[in-house]
Amino acid sequence: MTAKTAITALLLAALPAGSAMAVTVAEARGRVVRETMTFLNTPYLWGGMHPETGMDCSAFTKLVYEKAGLNLPRVSAEQFSRTLRLAPSDVRPGDLIFFAMKHPGTSRVDHVGIYVGKGFFVHASFTNGVHIDSVTNPYYYARLVSVRKYAGF
């Protein structure tokens, strides 16, 4: 076994099951958007983490990213702090969009969704479960804190 083969074998062994070694940014973003759509109509459950019994907003984003081979923290405020800020004009499908639902007009993040393009995002809300909304909806727009991207996107 050559040194290169041995190193490759070690690297592959260290990857989580189902991971691809060389995934392009476009492929990763595409996976995030595709996975996002598979959870539409999942019920909302605060603190919930399973699509059959219900999940909250940050469990939804964590699970979507996980299924796309990416790791996010469990809580929306931690997801916010571990991602990179974007100018609104730079947002792309697969990016995260953060809100201050309980304290509009502040930067106290307590809600997160995934931008899917053309002004729309998918999120888990108390009233509708996982569904699509418009960023320009006055209710959400007034509570928008930031759009952010996963490091490497």
Question: In which residue ranges do the predicted regions lie?
Answer:
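Sec/Tat signal peptide C-region and signal peptidase I cleavage site
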Residues: 18-22
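Secreted/periplasmic proteins that engage bacterial cell-wall peptidoglycan
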Residues: 36, 42-74
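Aromatic- and glycine-rich peptidoglycan recognition patches
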Residues: 23-34, 42, 49, 70, ...
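Bacterial N-terminal signal peptides
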Residues: 9-16
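Short alpha-helix capping/helix-loop boundary micro-motifs
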Residues: 78-86
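Bacterial N-terminal signal peptides that target proteins for export
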Residues: 1-7
